[in-house]
């Protein structure tokens, strides 16, 4: 399980360090893709396969399903760590997530999210009403 929040930076070669607490669970190869809310998602291959199977079952006749599958798969890259625990982030994903230099990596149970520091701060300072969200989660049995 991925948990926690870590600050680090993109280097001049578009590499980021994956926090050591995340590396063992990720394995040697993993998936880096576009996420929702303007961040990047990182999935261990096993979790990606589970998600892939669910997405393959979505109906091709549904416009929203097709759009979501395109969004998710078009940004996906299988990547691996170098000996220093860094991963090369493709330019299209850097642009998508508006990553300049400072980044925040957060553990979100089965995935990691990579945010530009600016977007993470903005997200946390936004008018997100956690009380209202908690109430909705209660309705879902959480």
Swiss-Prot record:
Name this protein carries in UniProt: Transcriptional regulator MraZ
Any one of the GO BP annotations: negative regulation of DNA-templated transcription initiation
Gene from which the chain derives: mraZ
Record family assignment: Belongs to the MraZ family.
GO cellular component: cytoplasm; nucleoid
UniProt keyword annotations, A-Z: Cytoplasm, DNA-binding, Repeat, Transcription, Transcription regulation
Subunit structure: Forms oligomers.
Predominant cellular place of this UniProt entry's protein: cytoplasm
PANTHER family: TRANSCRIPTIONAL REGULATOR MRAZ (PTHR34701:SF1)
Localization, UniProt: Cytoplasm, Nucleoid
Recorded GO MF terms: DNA-binding transcription factor activity; transcription cis-regulatory region binding
Domain SpoVT-AbrB: from-to ranges: 5-47, 76-119
Keyword Transcription regulation carried by entry: yes
Organism: Clostridium acetobutylicum (strain ATCC 824 / DSM 792 / JCM 1419 / IAM 19013 / LMG 5710 / NBRC 13948 / NRRL B-527 / VKM B-1787 / 2291 / W)
């Amino acid at each position: 399980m991925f948990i926690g929040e870590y600050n680090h930076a993109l280097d001049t070669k578009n590499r980021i360090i994956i926090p050591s607490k995340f590396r063992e669970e990720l394995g040697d190869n993993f998936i880096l893709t576009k996420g929702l809310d303007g961040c990047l998602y990182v999935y261990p291959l096993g979790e990606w396969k589970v998600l892939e199977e669910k997405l393959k079952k979505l109906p091709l006749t549904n416009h929203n399903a097709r759009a979501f599958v395109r969004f998710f798969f078009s940004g996906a890259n299988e990547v691996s760590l170098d000996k220093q625990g860094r991963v090369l982030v493709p330019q299209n994903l850097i642009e998508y997530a508006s990553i300049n230099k400072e980044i925040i990596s957060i553990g979100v149970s089965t995935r990691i999210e990579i945010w530009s520091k600016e977007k993470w701060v903005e997200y946390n300072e936004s008018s997100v009403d956690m009380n209202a969200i908690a109430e909705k989660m209660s309705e879902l049995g959480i």
